């Protein structure tokens, strides 16, 4: 692939790691953010120490506070901003972008209030003449591992397979590999909903439960993720792939996962506000729990783990009692994931 110019909107941990992947592939990378100190640090010290204390970035990776500068003559745009500001940033892009570009996102969440997936938001806010079909970049990927060039395999999903293949080629190299998919609904819901299950798995750890319990919540969590996703129009096979079970494993079992760590802290009895302040990063699983619970209630989808986490976070229920309460739920067949 010829050298591409790529704007990454959001210089957080994942945005920075993906910037390095693209730079390794010989592409021109521009990181855009709104914190002057962070942008200056990336440009002068070539570090992003809030997320990676010991990593030095290539000097070719540039950062800017100016969105117009970031998007000038760009080939592709990657959104890696928190879910709650995706619409706002998309509106800003639509005002500045003056030519057609590939539009991608690598965030995992559902918009509070509207319950919309992020690709839908980008489609609504960026005119069709300025973008490709949106490509979703998602899968089992800790930024802490990708930044040190550990082997990572994820998914590029789009309704337009040509756009997905472009992104596959753009990112893939000897340590970072993408597979394509056309099931955007499945890939996005898998990426968003697994954060809820990771909170639950972390809570079990914080409460002192062992591997049996954690395996149970991850496996049954996959069942309810699939149940809701299929109701929304997803292909059930997607949930057995990288963006489904793959992402669920990596997020639901690792201390690198902020959602798992948040759940573990909740299990130990810590207050949510204190957890969020101590972590200093967005915990998407917290807001996604509320959105998923509301969707499940509206559509009549059985999601007992999501319900238990919701009641603990938003209704003040004891998290141990909420989780143990699932043990007395109605008996079901294991294969009834679709009901």
Swiss-Prot record:
Pathway(s) where this gene product acts: Membrane lipid metabolism; glycerophospholipid metabolism
Top-level taxon of the source organism: Bacteria
GO molecular function terms listed in the Swiss-Prot or TrEMBL record: glycerol-3-phosphate dehydrogenase [NAD(P)+] activity; NAD binding
GO BP annotations listed: carbohydrate metabolic process; glycerol-3-phosphate biosynthetic process; glycerol-3-phosphate catabolic process; glycerophospholipid metabolic process; phospholipid biosynthetic process
Substrates-to-products reaction catalysed: sn-glycerol 3-phosphate + NAD(+) = dihydroxyacetone phosphate + NADH + H(+); sn-glycerol 3-phosphate + NADP(+) = dihydroxyacetone phosphate + NADPH + H(+)
Binding site for NADPH: 13-14, 108, 143, 258, 282, 284
Residues the entry annotates as binding sn-glycerol 3-phosphate: 108, 139, 141, 194, 247, 257-259
Keywords, alphabetical: Cytoplasm, Lipid biosynthesis, Lipid metabolism, NAD, NADP, Nucleotide-binding, Oxidoreductase, Phospholipid biosynthesis, Phospholipid metabolism
Enzyme class, spelled out: oxidoreductase
UniProt-listed Enzyme Commission number(s): 1.1.1.94
Major location (coarse): cytoplasm
Classification via Pfam families: NAD_Gly3P_dh_C (PF07479), NAD_Gly3P_dh_N (PF01210)
PROSITE patterns named in the record: NAD_G3PDH
A GO CC annotation given for this chain: cytosol
Active site: 194 (proton acceptor)
Location of the protein in the cell: Cytoplasm
Cross-referenced NCBIfam families: PRK00094.1-2, PRK00094.1-3, PRK00094.1-4
Protein family: Belongs to the NAD-dependent glycerol-3-phosphate dehydrogenase family.
Function: Catalyzes the reduction of the glycolytic intermediate dihydroxyacetone phosphate (DHAP) to sn-glycerol 3-phosphate (G3P), the key precursor for phospholipid synthesis.
Designated name of the protein: Glycerol-3-phosphate dehydrogenase [NAD(P)+]
């Amino acid at each position: 692939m010829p050298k591409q110019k790529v704007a990454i909107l959001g210089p957080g941990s994942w945005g920075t790691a993906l910037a390095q992947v693209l730079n390794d592939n010989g592409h021109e990378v521009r990181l855009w953010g709104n914190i002057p100190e962070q942008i200056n640090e990336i440009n002068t010290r070539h570090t992003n120490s809030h997320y990676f204390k010991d990593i030095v970035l290539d000097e070719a990776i540039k950062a800017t506070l100016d969105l117009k500068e970031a998007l000038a003559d760009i080939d592709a745009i990657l959104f890696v901003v928190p879910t709650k500001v995706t619409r706002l940033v998309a509106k800003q892009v639509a005002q500045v972008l003056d030519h057609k570009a590939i539009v991608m996102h690598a965030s995992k969440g559902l918009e509070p209030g509207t319950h919309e997936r992020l690709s839908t938001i980008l489609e609504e806010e960026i005119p069709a003449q300025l973008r490709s079909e949106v490509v979703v970049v998602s899968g089992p990927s800790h930024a802490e591992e990708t930044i040190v060039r550990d082997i990572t395999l994820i998914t590029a999903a789009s309704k337009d397979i040509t756009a997905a293949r472009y992104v596959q080629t753009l990112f893939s190299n000897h340590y970072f590999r993408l597979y394509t998919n056309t099931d955007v609904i499945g890939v996005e819901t898998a990426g968003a909903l697994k954060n809820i299950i990771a909170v639950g798995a972390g809570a079990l750890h914080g409460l002192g439960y062992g591997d049996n319990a954690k395996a149970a919540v991850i496996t049954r969590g996959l069942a309810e993720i699939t149940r809701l996703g299929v109701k929304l129009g997803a292909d059930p096979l997607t949930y057995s792939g990288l963006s489904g079970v793959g992402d669920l494993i990596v997020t639901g079992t690792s201390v690198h996962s902020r959602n798992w760590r948040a759940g573990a802290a909740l299990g130990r009895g810590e207050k949510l506000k204190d957890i969020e302040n101590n972590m200093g990063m967005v915990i998407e699983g917290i807001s996604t729990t509320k959105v998923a619970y509301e969707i499940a209630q509206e559509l009549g989808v059985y999601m007992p783990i999501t319900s238990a986490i919701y009641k603990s976070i938003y209704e003040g229920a004891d998290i141990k009692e909420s989780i143990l309460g699932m043990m007395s739920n109605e008996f079901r067949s294991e294969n009834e994931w679709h009901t």
